[in-house]
């Protein structure tokens, strides 16, 4: 569940809401109504109305809609000769008159479908000079709200005496943004929401990648920092008008949030207290953080520190890892105490047993982590390694070398030990790192992050590894494709899918760990028992644990299958069957073969032969890790060649699919994708390549006077290069 932002806590007490939708939200291309977008907003407002909120809508769009209709009418009534003449600009007030009826007709139709009554309320600025008018307006709106009617306000542009350019000549209101602010004050609203075509107020034009979204507007801080871009071509005011209206309302006592009308459920998110859009509040200056560090700042700092790390010698980088390993062991008691608090809190909160199991750092875990960090330190330095060397032409040498990817964003759930593995891999590979762990491991992640960053020398800086503590920062981070180079999610299918659908940054990872063990008819019973038990029970919550047991059909006749099942049942494993196995073994039939239990449970099914097992794995598996138990080498080779998974084993537990056990030192995750890295991802998976060319003044000059040799040259190992003085 997404956490409530503390600065938005007032939202829980909101009763009366004014929502203003701008022309850019109401209309789409060509000035026509954006039916889908507007319909989604109406559904949110109807739901709020049903939940007891008092909803007031201020809607722009009449002029734009009317202009579109009048242009069509003008086209229909024009001759070909008329169309060759310069076209006169349509009168805005006539457009407003025509468009208002169409706009209101849409609202009536849409809200009627949602069983909500609406009322049209057209006002002009001059009306508000009359005290009696304002009093009557308030009484009328209150009466409507008591009957669950939604008033729909708009300025009556058709009869307004104001002319373009629109200015605040009267001090009352000058567009629908300022009208919404005025109404929120007059009608004593608890909140004003201004819906725009952008996510909120930025420090510069939203199209500029360096512009930052301002989550909380602080007048004293931001009013001189903001550079406004061009306003919408459809509307009148743009962001400048919205900010001015928001400041007026906020300092009059009504909180304001500017957010996108394009994003689904944004109104509902605002009222749940989530950090969307930009908040304007009269007390905002009291909430300003001591250090205003944005997601972009964290990513940029991580990149700068990574460049300092790469500039160190191989021995210095190795020493950092040894220092981290030592620091982990020295602080073992403190780490364990914080982890115990996380585990106790998770159990008290009623988290699933599988999640709690992943959260626990068992005795000896810190020592094991320290050992893996030391193993990683002693591996060959991966940075700057020459992978290929080519003589392009005489005295023109080209080298393909290994290089860090840049800045990594790792989002992981539950397992705090993953933080240590990921951080050590990032340091060894020379990458900057941003980490976001699950809130259930908050204390464990915080202490591990502190221990690790304290061990990093000042010449590099602790900002090499940033710890993201608020879930609300993740959407911001996923937009930073110019400063974050790779995202690696480690967690549930839902988490991985959400991240893949929310970013342009390349994503490396797997959504499911549905691992199979297939026991062939020639498999040895004792070996099968050991492998199946280990694959399921060594760590049931692991992504490389067995989730489906496939058995050759011949084994159901000789008692082999019964013996296997007995072993699992006596060890507390809950069994679910496919159609054949459930009938044979009298166990519940599984709802889906594509299911990751992450607990002491698994699916069992009987297949015809190795080809049936392969087909089952391809249809229902996740391309993670699959194993065959057989003494028939020919059958084993068929399985190993044809199963299209990241890791395929013969007579070995799926639990071996692990970076540490593969000798990678540690792993940042397991990838089931087919691009860049596959299987357990260690240091190699966090590297890319660069091309280094050394010449003696050669130029292309149309390839005249140069003879390409493209001769492969021997690549010296690093130790050989040092010995030869290269």
UniProtKB/Swiss-Prot annotation:
UniProt-annotated stretches for the region Glutamate 5-kinase: 1-296
Pfam families according to UniProt: AA_kinase, Aldedh
A GO BP annotation: L-proline biosynthetic process
A molecular-function term among this protein's GO annotations: ATP binding
Binding-site residues for substrate, renumbered to this chain: 60, 157, 176
EC code(s) of this entry: 2.7.2.11, 1.2.1.41
Associated pathway: Amino-acid biosynthesis; L-proline biosynthesis; L-glutamate 5-semialdehyde from L-glutamate: step 1/2; Amino-acid biosynthesis; L-proline biosynthesis; L-glutamate 5-semialdehyde from L-glutamate: step 2/2
Residue segments, region Gamma-glutamyl phosphate reductase: 297-717
Catalyzed chemical reaction(s): L-glutamate + ATP = L-glutamyl 5-phosphate + ADP; L-glutamate 5-semialdehyde + phosphate + NADP(+) = L-glutamyl 5-phosphate + NADPH + H(+)
Keywords: Amino-acid biosynthesis, ATP-binding, Kinase, Multifunctional enzyme, NADP, Nucleotide-binding, Oxidoreductase, Proline biosynthesis, Transferase
PROSITE patterns according to UniProt: GLUTAMATE_5_KINASE, PROA
InterPro entries: AceGlu_kinase-like_sf (IPR036393), Ald_DH/histidinol_DH (IPR016161), Ald_DH_C (IPR016163), Ald_DH_N (IPR016162), Aldehyde_DH_dom (IPR015590), Asp/Glu/Uridylate_kinase (IPR001048), G-glutamylP_reductase_CS (IPR020593), G5K_ProBA (IPR041744)
HAMAP family (alphabetical): ProA, ProB
Protein known as: Delta-1-pyrroline-5-carboxylate synthase B
Origin species: Arabidopsis thaliana (Mouse-ear cress)
